[in-house]
């Protein structure tokens, strides 16, 4: 039977490191993700219907068929704008040390 060193057994009793430093960063990241998720859903749908009714049919007097087509283009452009904004915010949200490389 092996005898275990008491110091080695006490080393296992050390609590795991606290991740509270990253907790705020995680909450901030989730808030950003939730914001852009809602924006990704609401903005294109809202722009589709509002541009169809008020801009293309109301202002320009287009037919129902043509207004569907152009409103869809507006919605697709809105999706791409939201995606570009998300990538920009996500890129700049990281710590400057991570982007520049670790400097000791």
UniProtKB/Swiss-Prot annotation:
It comes from the Eukaryota. The chain crosses the membrane at residues 29-49, 69-89. Keywords: Cytoplasmic vesicle, Endoplasmic reticulum, Membrane, Transmembrane, Transmembrane helix. This is Vacuolar ATPase assembly integral membrane protein vma21. Required for the assembly of the V0 complex of the vacuolar ATPase (V-ATPase) in the endoplasmic reticulum. It is a multi-pass membrane protein. Residues 50-68 are lumenal. InterPro entries: Vma21. GO terms for cellular component: endoplasmic reticulum membrane; endoplasmic reticulum-Golgi intermediate compartment membrane; ER to Golgi transport vesicle membrane. Coiled coil: none annotated. Residues 1-28, 90-104 are cytoplasmic. It is found in: Endoplasmic reticulum membrane; Endoplasmic reticulum-Golgi intermediate compartment membrane; Cytoplasmic vesicle, COPII-coated vesicle membrane. One of its GO terms (biological process) is vacuolar proton-transporting V-type ATPase complex assembly.
